[in-house]
Amino acid sequence: MDWFKRETLKQLQKKSNNSSFKVVIKTIEKCFSILTKTKNVTVSYNFDNSDLDIQHKYRSKNILSSLNRINDGYKYAIGLIANIAYRMAELNPQLRNKVLYTPGIVIIDAIELHLDVDLQMNILKILTDTFPNIQFITSTFSPLVIGSIESENLIILRKQEGN
């Protein structure tokens, strides 16, 4: 959140035109739109409450939410995706608006933690749609996560006797 606040201040003072910052904002907006099935999502930093404001349209109504007031599962998913986008943007600034197409591998342990049933069934699709050139390696105990992927993308590890 500190990074988001600093970058917002730089933008307001016209001391920066950080393309990494813009990529992270767009990624959060896209993620929130997919998660909540809403449109016209805009994210901004609110200095009064030191939180992100998320404005969106739902059933033709304009809604303003703060990140701290949304479902914990959504918060976790948005945080995870924003973190990946931030790291991609910081490591590959030369890619500018194409940074989400950075190839790589991301390892996530126990991806189902903090996610409700719907998110467990959709998190891998959201990740692969958002970052199409990333290979995600995840561990899970959730049958919902396992059931959400094609069998050719699944490796089951079993403990062997004596090991």
Predicted regions and their residues:
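Coupling/switch segment of ABC-type P-loop NTPase heads
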Residues: 1-35
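Hydrophobic, Leu/Ile/Phe/Ala-enriched alpha-helical segments that form helix-helix packing faces
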Residues: 24-39, 84, 88, 127, ...
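Intrinsically disordered, low-complexity segments enriched in polar/charged residues with Gly/Pro
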Residues: 29-31, 40-41, 114, 141-143
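Long, charged, glycine-rich C-terminal linkers/tails
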Residues: 38-55
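Switch/communication elements of ASCE P-loop NTPase nucleotide-binding domains
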Residues: 51-163
